[in-house]
């Protein structure tokens, strides 16, 4: 037995005969203590990709030498992608097995065989998001949804989840403006187009 539902408006948890948790239903409904913050969203700036070099050849060489762009096949070959026996897509595809897979697909764990799978993809450009959190989050949704659609998933069946990585916010309204702008960018695209 994990839990027993009673008519009492309290959530109680016992361990070895000792009550270790005793919370009122009103507190649970409140989602904790109420908090407020002042927020000021600064206008975003334009991000223009820049690569070191004076000629096209130098810029291209610096671009493909960037760890965010270069091939990660050697690293991927060090891991067994078939562990768990539910993987649908291999890490690399194409005629020569050199094209990285842009999404993850795995069969659902059920008894017997299944033709149903779940998919997952991500999108994020740290440079764009640093310059304009609203546009960065907006484009992160575009990128992740596009990857899944290209992998064969229907955009109407997708659920979005968001992870945020921002500096410690303290009480500075401008700092609070960054996650708010990112949330609004992701929400804007999600409500209108997906």
Model regions: which residues?
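Glycine/proline-enriched, intrinsically flexible loops and inter-domain linkers
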Residues: 1-192
